[in-house]
Curated annotation (Swiss-Prot):
Protein name: Relaxin receptor 2
Gene3D superfamilies in UniProt: Low-density Lipoprotein Receptor, Rhodopsin 7-helix transmembrane proteins, Ribonuclease Inhibitor
Subcellular location: Cell membrane
Disulphide connectivity of cysteines: C28-C41, C35-C54, C48-C63, C478-C556
LRR repeats: 121-142, 145-166, 169-190, 193-214, 217-238, 241-262, 265-286, 289-310, 313-334, 337-358
Glycan attachment sites: N37, N121, N257, N318, N361
Record's signal peptide: none
Keyword Cytoplasm belongs to the record: no
GO biological process: one example: hormone-mediated signaling pathway
């Protein structure tokens, strides 16, 4: 194990020389980013981690995702209500519950049931949280100086066509959180100076192009959480200055090529949380000035390859939480100015580096899987920061895993080494079987080595794993560890299957001559190792087909695969675990079941056996624990694989628990089940300890052992009835050591 530690490669900060006096940004290798104007480059994980790794603070600059226009406009809803009021009131007439400052009037929660009579010089009127149910014709006609009206949280159900007649100076109108179901065309036709129109949280189901007649100055339109199912053709035809449109949380089911045909000034378009399932290729072709587009949380399954072709100025794109099945390789080719791309909760089965290369200005990217970050090495900030198996700081997410990885590694490694030593020291009469057990221990010992490495790298990266996570999973060490674990697993599975079949033939068919001899056994063992080696090494041969087969997670074991995997790696993994290993498990369970039935049948037919029930219990217990250890080891793996076929989301931490607690069960228990608890081993050990004091007892036990035919070396575990079954054939079956 310890010579393999020389493969450890420490991740160092890279320095690149520049000519004297040069002020250009240094060229950094893939996955590294410059420290401002210094000659130093740091890995991506060292940027924006809260630590000044550069020395000049450059790695902690520009960490926030400020692309798009949200920061330019500020928090729209908050700014609209926080109006600076003077202390003196200049209004002559207003209701007593209202608060007047200057020419601005607030009648909040004043139990008003209609628009009150106020002074004509009022410029701001806030009627929030009252009981106004309707706005009749010309209700504001006397208040032509109004610039802002706030009518949120009333229960307005009806607005007359001429309700806002004469409000030529109105700039901001809030009608959110009401009960408006329909708005008549032309209701806003006198609002020539209106810049903000907020209609959030109303049960509006339908709108027409004519609804917005007169809104020639409208800059911001918000219809969040309405019940819209469709948009009118050329929605912006009456709003030539519209810059920001927010339609989040509606029921819009489709878009057309003409939906935004006249929205030439639009810079921000929000369409998240709708039911859009398809977007035509020319939908956004007229949005030449669009800077931010949000299509998240819809039902889009496919995007045309050139849908973003005309969005040359787009800075921020959010496609997260869509059931996209495929992204074209040139999907983002025209987005040269894009700075932020959100693909969270999207599986990308055909992901490749070329997909993101054209976006050279990209500074923030968000994925579903941590490993996707390796396909965008030029992006400074990539999320998520971990693979879900590990925590943000550590390779192993909690103290239980950190402690038991060493405990199980020690038990597995040194338990098997002890058995190898004792088997080599104690002379066995059946040398071929003893050799098979020692070979099994060698394979199981590799699992202990693998766990030691996991524990070692957990200590190495303790407290800073997220900085090294991606580099670690792509490293040669991680791949070699995965190779060791796979080699150990497959050789152990094949050897256990072989030993089970060997035992099966001896017990169920004691008079047959199809059991292998010494040389045949050696050939079988060599073939098992070759097959196991090939299974483990094949993913290295064609990386473009299998991808980083072992580097999918922090523990470097290809256990769980989602739908985003390459067809090669996914099929290969399923073939191994649900093909080879599941078949081997079924063979072992079936064989031990038949063996137990055969022994029980023989015991019932043999009258010489004094205590058949006790011996049946002993055999049943032994066989149960052998099968049970296999079940503990493999059933969780089979369940995970089957669930992955049905696209069931499984927490990443499950992998580390299975790899540390379940997968090594066989490797840890095999020395106990096949050697340490057998009567043969216990008797031999006693004989060695009492060699000089009890020579006579030693000879007696040796003589009794020489008649045993049990292939597990446990002469007391199996029925003496079996001996009666093959009394005439003792010379056919060699005693098992």
């Amino acid at each position: 194990m310890f010579p393999l530690l020389h493969f450890i490669v420490l991740i160092d900060v890279k320095d690149f020389p520049l000519t004297e006096g040069s002020t250009i940004t240094p060229l950094c290798q893939k996955g590294y980013f410059p420290c401002g104007n210094l000659t130093k480059c740091l890995p991506r994980a060292f940027h924006c981690d809260g630590v000044d790794d550069c020395g000049n603070g450059a790695d902690e600059d520009n960490c926030g995702d400020t692309s798009g226009w949200a920061t330019i406009f500020g928090t729209v809803h908050g700014n609209a209500n926080n109006v600076a009021l003077t202390q003196e009131c200049f209004l002559n007439q207003y209701p007593q519950p209202c608060d007047c400052k200057g020419t601005e009037l607030e009648c909040i929660n004043a139990d008003l049931r209609a628009v009150p009579v106020i002074s004509s010089n009022t410029t701001l009127l806030s009627l929030k949280k009252n009981k106004i149910h309707s706005l009749p014709d010309k209700v504001f006609t006397k208040y032509t100086q109004l610039k802002q009206i706030f009518l949120q949280h009333n229960c307005i159900t009806h607005i007359s066509r001429k309700a806002f007649f004469g409000l030529h100076n109105l700039q901001i109108l809030y009608l959110s959180h009401n009960c408006i179901t329909t708005l008549r065309p032309g209701v806003f036709k006198d609002l020539h100076q209106l810049t903000w129109l907020i209609l959030d949280d109303n049960p509006i189901t339908r709108i027409s192009q004519q609804l917005f007649t007169g809104l020639k100055s409208l800059f911001f339109l918000s219809m969040v959480n309405n019940y819209l199912e469709a948009l009118p053709k050329q929605m912006c035809a009456q709003m030539p200055q519209l810059n920001w449109m927010d339609l989040e949380g509606n029921g819009i089911k489709y878009l057309t090529n003409s939906s935004f045909l006249s929205c030439n000034s639009l810079t921000v378009l929000f369409l998240p949380r709708n039911q859009i399932d398809f977007v035509p290729e020319k939908t956004f072709s007229s949005l030449k000035n669009l800077g931010e587009l949000d299509l998240s949380s819809n039902m889009i399954m496919e995007l045309p390859p050139e849908i973003f072709k005309d969005l040359k100025l787009l800075q921020k794109l959010n496609l997260s939480s869509n059931p996209l099945l495929y992204l074209h390789k040139n999907q983002f080719e025209s987005l040269k100015q894009l700075q932020s791309l959100d693909l969270e909760r999207i599986e990308i089965p055909n992901i490749n580096t070329r997909m993101f290369q054209p976006m050279m200005n990209l500074s923030h990217i968000y994925f579903k899987n941590f490993r996707y970050c390796s396909y965008a090495p030029h992006v400074r900030i990539c999320m998520p920061l971990t693979d879900g198996i590990s925590s943000f700081e550590d390779l192993l997410a909690n103290n239980i895993l950190r402690i038991f990885v060493w405990v199980i590694a020690f038990i597995t490694c040194f338990g098997n080494l002890f058995v190898i030593g004792m088997r080599s020291f104690i002379k066995a009469e059946n040398t071929t079987h003893a050799t098979s057990i020692k070979i099994l221990c060698c394979a199981d010992c590799l699992m202990g080595v693998y766990l030691f490495f996991i524990g070692f790298f957990d200590i190495k990266y303790r407290g800073q794993y997220q900085k090294y996570a991606l580099l670690w999973m792509e490293s040669l060490q991680c791949r070699l560890m995965g190779f060791l674990a796979m080699l150990s697993t497959e050789v152990s599975v094949l050897l256990l299957t072989y030993l089970t079949l060997e035992k099966f033939l001896a017990i169920v068919f004691p008079f047959s001559n199809i059991r292998p001899g010494k040389w045949q056994t050696m050939v079988i063992l060599i073939c098992i190792w070759i097959v196991g080696f090939l299974i483990a090494v094949i993913p290295f041969w064609k990386e473009d087909y299998f991808g980083n087969f072992y580097g999918k997670n922090g523990v470097c074991f290809p256990l769980y695969y989602d739908q985003t995997e390459d067809i090669g790696s996914k099929g290969y993994s399923l073939g191994i675990f649900l093909g080879v290993n599941l078949l081997a498990f079924l063979i072992i369970v079936f064989s031990y079941t038949i063996m137990f039935c055969s022994i029980k049948k023989t015991a019932l037919q043999t009258s010489e056996v004094r205590n058949p029930i006790g011996r049946e219990v002993a055999v049943a217990n032994r066989f149960f624990f052998i099968v049970f250890s296999d079940a503990i080891c493999w059933i969780p793996v089979f369940v995970i694989k089957i669930l992955s076929l049905f696209r069931v989301e499984i927490p990443g931490t499950i992998t580390s628990w299975i790899v540390i607690f379940f997968l090594p069960v066989n490797s840890a228990l095999n020395p106990i089940l096949y050697t340490l608890t057998t009567s043969f081993f216990k008797d031999k050990l006693k004989q060695l300890l009492h060699k000089h004091r009890r020579k006579s007892i030693f000879k007696t036990k040796k003589k009794s052992l020489s008649t045993s035919i049990v292939w597990t070396d446990d002469s007391s575990s199996l029925k003496l009835g079996v001996l009666n079954k093959i009394t005439l054939g003792d010379s056919i079956v060699k005693p098992i050591s």
